[in-house]
Structures are given as C-alpha cells and as structure tokens.
Amino acid sequence: MFASTWQTRAVGVLIGCLLDVVFGDPKRGHPVALFGRAAAKLEQITYRDGRVAGAVHVGLLVGAVGLLGAALQRLPGRCWPVAATATATWAALGGTSLARTGRQISDLLERDDVEAARRLLPSLCGRDPAQLGGPGLTRAALESVAENTADAQVVPLLWAASSGVPAVLGYRAINTLDSMIGYRSPRYLRFGWAAARLDDWANYVGARATAVLVVICAPVVGGSPRGAVRAWRRDAARHPSPNAGVVEAAFAGALDVRLGGPTRYHHELQIRPTLGDGRSPKVADLRRAVVLSRVVQAGAAVLAVMLVYRRRP
C-alpha cells in the first residue's frame, strides 16, 4: 500500500497526531499508566540508594520498551507498520489532555474555585498546590503547559518521525521515569539521577525546536516573537532544567508575562530565577498559553513530516 518506509512513517505519525487531537488520552488502560505501574513494581526490587541501581532500573525498563517497539514495527502485514507507528505516536502524545486540563483550571480560577483548581493541578505537574492561591495556581499551570508542550507534544513527534516506533516508545518511557523518580528528594537524589540525565539528553534538541515553534507561532495569540527570542536568550540558562527553561522562557517572552520565582514541591521549596520581564500571568494568559501550545503541536506535526521526507533514501 505504501511505497517505502518513509511514507509509512509519515502517514503513521500524522494518523497518531490526529488520534490525539480527536480522542485525547484513553480514560482507562493508557499504555503510559500501565508502564508507570510496572515501573513502580520493579522499583520495589531494584531500589537501592545509589546511581548504579537507578541506572539498572532505567536500563531494564527503557530497554524492554525499546525491544517491544522494535518487535511491533517488524510484524508482517501491509498495513501493520502504519498502524504500529500511529498507535505508538498516539500513546506518546498528550496534547489534547494537556489543553483540556489547562482550560479546566482556567474555568475554575475564573469562578474563584481555588480548591477545585488545587485538586486538579497535580494532573499537570508535581507541584504542591496546598499553599497556592489563584495567582500561584495560574503561574504553575502556565509553566506546566509550556514545559509539556515539549514533553507531551513536540518531542514525541520528532522522535517518531526520526527513528520510528522503538524511539518514540523509548522516549515516553524515559520521560515517564523522569516524572516518577527524577527528583532531588532524599529518596531519589541518587536513584533518580540516571532517569533525569537521560531525560535531559532525550529532550535537548526537541526543547529547542519547541522554542523555535513558539517564536514562529506567537503572533497567533497576539504574542511577540521578538519577546520570545529575547527571553529565551537571556533567561533560559538560569532555569535549573536545561530544557524546561528554554521552553518556559520562550512562552514567557511570547506572552509578555513573568514566570519563575518560589516554586514549592512536596519535597522542597525552590527559589527559581524569573523568566521574562512582563506582568504576573493572569487567567487570560493561561488560556492564550493553551492555544499557543496547540498551534505549536500542529507546527510540530508539519515539521515531523518534513523530517521524515528529508531522511528518505
């Protein structure tokens, strides 16, 4: 049906992206949730307070997922490679769920339902919402939408386009492990080191591609491409993450808001440098961030297909 591997991959990536747009994440039996439960079970066996144990834990899980992806990609059948690529891409994406949650938090904050917004925030990020009021919840949600524009939208598409099913599933495994154990808490400071470093590597190029797309797409929401570039160049390196800082700074500059500052997690309070030099974000800015995130995903889909065609024989 399809003439070559590159056509198969391009069609599969586009179908996977459309499945995410139309259906979002499945409510039950999501592959990422199943992987997370398996990882938690394995951690009961592999956990030791050291980097080597953490590297073994990550290697076993990411290796298993990569081998599964390679096997799925090589199953016989004329339509199977497209179906495998589409399914893997869909499973790795989370743009629709991200946008839905961002809009829901916006709605709750506009109704001054701070308690409900606090309950919903953990589905976006690992912040401790207990002490956050409306402004803090708005900033936390906007920063999470920005960071996850890369993690849950752009980067999976680029891995799927460049290297197929094993790569996109492996990437999602790495990113999930980072969200589970890549913390600087007493338990995970050493055990989670490998997951955090591997996630930094896996997102490095994609985060910068995301920032470029933010610059290009900023005018769609009345944003400033020049402001995005300025904040990216000036502020990104101040962020503790080499990748999240790039994307969050670009969003801050594009939307003319100021992000960063005191950031409380369950295990620690971080005093982060500010990103951007605009106003404190309002609920309307969170809504703009959600729209910008969706437009960036559409741009990433186009970029992914271009990448596949560029790599064809």
Curated annotation (Swiss-Prot):
Bilayer disposition of the protein: Multi-pass membrane protein
Can you provide one Gene Ontology molecular function annotated for this UniProt record? ABC-type vitamin B12 transporter activity
Question: According to its UniProt record, in which pathway does this protein act?
Answer: Cofactor biosynthesis; adenosylcobalamin biosynthesis
Name a single GO cellular component. Answer: plasma membrane
Transmembrane residue ranges = 52-72, 79-99, 154-174, 204-224, 289-309
Question: What are the alphabetically sorted keywords of the record?
Answer: Cell membrane, Cobalamin biosynthesis, Membrane, Transmembrane, Transmembrane helix
- Subcellular localization: Cell membrane
Pfam families noted in UniProt:
CobD_Cbib (PF03186)
Q: Its domain of life? A: Bacteria
Q: Which GO terms describe its biological process?
A: cobalamin biosynthetic process
Q: Enumerate the HAMAP family for this protein.
A: CobD_CbiB (MF_00024)
In which family does this protein belong, per the annotation?
A: Belongs to the CobD/CbiB family.
Function comment: Converts cobyric acid to cobinamide by the addition of aminopropanol on the F carboxylic group.
Q: Can you name this protein?
A: Cobalamin biosynthesis protein CobD
Please name the gene that encodes this protein: cobD
